[in-house]
Amino acid sequence: MIRMAFAVACGGVIGTLLRFALATWVSAQWPRHFYLATVAVNLLGCLLIGYLYATFLARPDISPELRGALIIGFLGALTTFSSFSLDALRLLESGQLATAFAYVGGSVLGGLLAAWAGLALARL
């Protein structure tokens, strides 16, 4: 358990630093489009989680610690959108279309509503 926690923490540090670097660079390139930095890290995270998922399926010998460092730590720090996308992809791949669409729609709408609620609470 300690080894896994350390691996996840190490991956998280790297993911955090990459997110900071990418967001800083993208924001400097397109300062009027604040959302592009988030889109960039989310899309990168989705690309990477798809790649890693396929790699881990093909290579079951990859250690749980490395898997945890990359998926939970690195991509978790880079973006949680990648995990959301993988969950939706797995639902689609398993033929659970209604659940996948409910998950995607509910997550997006729920996220927007939660962000709005947080904004409203902060303004009280």
From Swiss-Prot:
<keyword id="KW-0812">Transmembrane</keyword>
<feature type="transmembrane region" description="Helical">
    <location>
        <begin position="101"/>
        <end position="121"/>
    </location>
</feature>
<comment type="function">
    <text>Fluoride-specific ion channel. Important for reducing fluoride concentration in the cell, thus reducing its toxicity.</text>
</comment>
<dbReference type="Pfam" id="PF02537">
    <property type="entry name" value="CRCB"/>
</dbReference>
<keyword id="KW-1003">Cell membrane</keyword>
<dbReference type="GO" id="GO:0062054">
    <property type="term" value="F:fluoride channel activity"/>
</dbReference>
<keyword id="KW-0406">Ion transport</keyword>
<feature type="binding site">
    <location>
        <position position="79"/>
    </location>
    <ligand>
        <name>Na(+)</name>
    </ligand>
</feature>
<keyword id="KW-0813">Transport</keyword>
<dbReference type="GO" id="GO:0046872">
    <property type="term" value="F:metal ion binding"/>
</dbReference>
<feature type="transmembrane region" description="Helical">
    <location>
        <begin position="34"/>
        <end position="54"/>
    </location>
</feature>
<feature type="transmembrane region" description="Helical">
    <location>
        <begin position="6"/>
        <end position="26"/>
    </location>
</feature>
<keyword id="KW-0472">Membrane</keyword>
<keyword id="KW-0915">Sodium</keyword>
<keyword id="KW-1133">Transmembrane helix</keyword>
<feature type="transmembrane region" description="Helical">
    <location>
        <begin position="69"/>
        <end position="89"/>
    </location>
</feature>
<keyword id="KW-0407">Ion channel</keyword>
<dbReference type="GO" id="GO:0140114">
    <property type="term" value="P:cellular detoxification of fluoride"/>
</dbReference>
<keyword id="KW-0997">Cell inner membrane</keyword>
<comment type="similarity">
    <text>Belongs to the fluoride channel Fluc/FEX (TC 1.A.43) family.</text>
</comment>
<dbReference type="GO" id="GO:0005886">
    <property type="term" value="C:plasma membrane"/>
</dbReference>
<feature type="binding site">
    <location>
        <position position="76"/>
    </location>
    <ligand>
        <name>Na(+)</name>
    </ligand>
</feature>
<keyword id="KW-0479">Metal-binding</keyword>
<protein>
    <recommendedName>
        <fullName>Fluoride-specific ion channel FluC</fullName>
    </recommendedName>
</protein>
<dbReference type="InterPro" id="IPR003691">
    <property type="entry name" value="FluC"/>
</dbReference>
